[in-house]
């Protein structure tokens, strides 16, 4: 039996090499396409300007497209700079490899402007850099004063003055709404303000079927269903000999291998001890009342004995339904177990495909319906 971690790496690399780019960006005039839904999802963030990875440090509201970018950003809070300059006499350190490479270019450029102060060997590629160096390090002059009323601060360079003005005196619009209907909007200072605006003013909706969603991420997952068939979405194939199963997500494939081929049963019934590989199978076991462990029977108000308290609740519910005279037990059973139609209030999950009126109580059941019918 293969080790699970090694097998996961093998699965990932194998599918990356063989996968076809079948997931197309739904935005007009964008011809991007990808081999996996996750890559398409990552790309779509550049259209919606969605940055789900938010820094959780107190007072910091910066957000990023990718988790790796957030990880790099957090180094500025911990002051971890793993990339160091290798030039002799230079102790500069940086948060990223890109910043280090940019710094190294400074060493490689010619530096014709040398400081003439006694004992100073600094050289610079620009004359303005030399002037700023002399003001800050030798004459200690601060030639750039803040011109705002009641502010007496001065700075050695124009850039430091501008940074001060932006931070202390002027409202900086860092984020603007990407939707065309918001052209001319003044924008937002914080990422969180932009996200609140988008949630309230621009509810994500499918351009194909018109269905609305709570988040852009839910919409992206939905769009993929319109663009491909189920078989096209199943790009993750089980590598175990004799197994022809395939899946739409790598996580589903890993779970399949863990449960079916390695026999890992993480969920068990507290009453009878029966083990299950999937949580929904345990839930179904509990809902159906198939637990065979002997226990004291429960008696309801009608004097009827039941194997468990769940049986009492089911009986009482049936009595209530009969008294309401809405539908017969036979009709209810057909509706509940066969058609999936009706009882809109109790079935919050509806099929998103046009002309399909199926509704479901559980999200899991809706996914099974989509995979088998669409």
Curated annotation (Swiss-Prot):
A zinc finger (C2H2-type) spans 23-47, 53-77, 83-107, 113-138, 144-169, 204-226, 236-261, 267-291, 349-374. The keyword Zinc-finger applies. It comes from the Eukaryota. It is found in: Nucleus. InterPro entries: Zinc_finger_trans_reg (IPR051061), Znf_C2H2_sf (IPR036236), Znf_C2H2_type (IPR013087). Keywords: DNA-binding, Metal-binding, Nucleus, Repeat, RNA-binding, Transcription, Transcription regulation, Zinc, Zinc-finger. One of its GO terms (biological process) is transcription initiation at RNA polymerase III promoter. SUPFAM superfamilies: beta-beta-alpha zinc fingers (SSF57667). GO terms for cellular component: cytosol; nucleus. GO terms for molecular function: 5S rRNA binding; DNA binding; RNA polymerase III general transcription initiation factor activity; zinc ion binding. Is required for correct transcription of 5S RNA genes by RNA polymerase III. Also binds the transcribed 5S RNA's. Initiates transcription of the 5S ribosomal RNA gene. This is Transcription factor IIIA. It comes from Schizosaccharomyces pombe (strain 972 / ATCC 24843) (Fission yeast). The lineage of its organism: Eukaryota, Fungi, Dikarya, Ascomycota, Taphrinomycotina.
